Amino acid sequence: MEVINHIAALKVSLRSARLAQQKIALVPTMGALHSGHVSLVKKAQELADIVVCSIFVNPTQFTDPKDLEKYPRPLEHDIRMLEHAGCDFVFMPSVTEMYPEPENWHIDLGPAEFLLEGEFRKGHYQGVTQIVKKLFDAVNPDLAFFGQKDYQQVL
């Protein structure tokens, strides 16, 4: 398993898989992994040739800075879990890698942005959609696997 911290290095590492027309799967996470994440990796392995799991605690989806500060980051544990699960690549970028400059863009999510969890966490889904787009741009996956707790995000 290869741990990668930079988008350019990730693209280089995935180039041979692309040239061989292998299917690439992305399992995006914020870390603090558990058996549910491992099950997503296993499902990705069934349907793709290469599995990339990202670990990135995205500051733009936290409305309260204290929540961001308190978010658990057991990186050694997470890496061991992914290695044991047989993940091919772990993409662990820094905040400056994903957000090199301040950004001010908006994705129109329609009314879904303000329903359910969005009603109580203003701006949360903008942050989620921004990082998912950035991860998709970095990995360019054929498949992506999200957990059940991300139901509203999938909508």
Question: What are the residue ranges of the model-derived segments?
Answer:
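Nucleotidyltransferase catalytic core that binds NTPs
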Residues: 2-155
